[in-house]
Amino acid sequence: MPHSKHRDYTADKQDIPYTELKACKSPWKHRTPAVKQSPVVLSEEQLKYAELTFHRTPQLQPRKQTVRRKRQGPKSAVWRVVTCVLGVLCVVLMITMGILVPKLFSGQEEQYRETSLHHLLKNDSSCDPCSHDWIAFGNNFYLFFRGTKSWAESKSACEELNSHLLDIDSKAELENLLLFEINGWILVKKNQTNWSSSENETKLQHTLIDEKKNHSCRYLRGSQFIADDCSSKKPYACEFNKM
């Protein structure tokens, strides 16, 4: 029995430090809630991060604008190329119009002159030089055409106007016609002249140039009478002698 009591006593002694240890550990359990300050620290860090992001956000906007400008760059270059091409086309069209329009109007004017004279001759057998662009020197009237025809076609066209192909029969008439720089068929042929005086006839023969075998028709170029093929196309002038 004494031995058992001794064991119980020792057991009680061992229980005492265990309870003391529990009692000593208990204050740490009460101090553990102090560790809960970490969320406060995190919230301060979050505030700093928010402030940093708030200061950085305005700097991102220019980058977006530069990206937009870079994206718009190729489109503006394409539009520049298109405008340059359109400008070149407009210049080319203006040049072509400036060249073609005068030719068109001159051709229409000549056709109108021929048709008006043709209708006039149908209505009246006599030619009225005052109603058209005839040029008068004394009793002679001249009408010049820019359209090209052969010698025979020019002669028949003048006959339809109740006139004849240009016939230079005097030196004074030639000097008057030199003022207009005429370049076209005349009525005289090879070995044929209407000049009355022998002096004028020799002058006509000396002014003939480029004479060939098949060139039996004459045309006037400035003050020169040139022999050429009758089938070649040249301008012509009609003459009307008013009595």
From Swiss-Prot:
Disulfide bonds join C158-C238, C217-C230. Residues 102-243 are extracellular. One of its GO terms (biological process) is positive regulation of natural killer cell mediated cytotoxicity. It is found in: Cell membrane. Heterodimer with KLRE1. Interacts with PTPN6. A motif (ITIM motif 1) lies at residues 16-21. The chain crosses the membrane at residues 81-101. Residues 1-80 are cytoplasmic. Residues 137-239 form the C-type lectin domain. This is Killer cell lectin-like receptor subfamily I member 1. One of its GO terms (molecular function) is transmembrane signaling receptor activity. GO terms for cellular component: external side of plasma membrane; plasma membrane. Glycans are attached at N123, N191, N194, N200, N214. Keywords: Cell membrane, Disulfide bond, Glycoprotein, Lectin, Membrane, Receptor, Signal-anchor, Transmembrane, Transmembrane helix. It is a single-pass type II membrane protein. Its main location: membrane. Lectin-like receptor for natural killer (NK) cells. Heterodimer formation with KLRE1 mediates inhibition of NK cell cytolytic activity.
